[in-house]
Amino acid sequence: MLRKKLLKILSVLTLFIFFQYVAKFGILESLALSIVYVLLMEILRDLEILAEKRVTYKLSSTEVTKYVVSEASIFVTSLAITFLLGGEILDGLAFGFFFLVYLQWFYNEAEMERVFNDFPTFPKIFLIYRFAITLFGSTICFYRFVFGDVLKSIVAGILTFALFLSQRALNLEYVTSGKFVRSVSNPQWYFRRVKHFILSAPAMGVGATAGYIAARSAEIESIIETVCWTFRAFLLLTIVVVCILTLGSWLGLKVHKKA
């Protein structure tokens, strides 16, 4: 219980740093946004209790609607708050996709396992929706937060989409084979490692806060800029780690087949 509360506090802190120094919002706005998004993620977690179900479970149209509505609530909230604070449409899109693609999916291990395990039972229209969000959302995020260049952002978005597809293709083949093993040869083992890696993000919030205090005391604005670049580097490092883990999943699947 204490660990979960601490994680929530660190998550709020990390988001606060993001809004304050990357999105350039005010202190009160950043704090409010951080709390709102953490609460939204908790609501989303409650809606996804059915994540405990295994591959034999088939989603009903009502449950698919719940997923879409819960995700849309995060996205619409991003747009609304951005407009209220005087932001541009691109900023609203970037914030919305950022929380869908990078925070919500990787923050919740149950969500990740549900997506992978229930992949064969998902309605095709829902899969298209997922794919579209990953491709377009990743491109927008890379453009707004990392590169600022359209071509580079499109390439990075396509690579992210390719990883998304390869992971699900690996898992689909593995799930439909009916063979599950609790070892490193199980692709899900690698997916859990991704989640644990992403959860290290709150530690960046602590480091960013320390950097901010140091910057204010020494009046060195470059330290704040360093914090922003650290955040951007974290996004890129995440993609690199996912690449490595995807390769590991593929090799693990091959080893398991030979065994």
From Swiss-Prot:
It comes from the Archaea. Keywords: Cell membrane, Membrane, Transmembrane, Transmembrane helix. The keyword Ribosomal protein does not apply. Its main location: membrane. GO terms for cellular component: plasma membrane. The chain crosses the membrane at residues 9-31, 84-106, 126-148, 153-175, 196-215, 230-252. It is found in: Cell membrane. It is a multi-pass membrane protein. This is Uncharacterized protein AF_1569. It comes from Archaeoglobus fulgidus (strain ATCC 49558 / DSM 4304 / JCM 9628 / NBRC 100126 / VC-16).
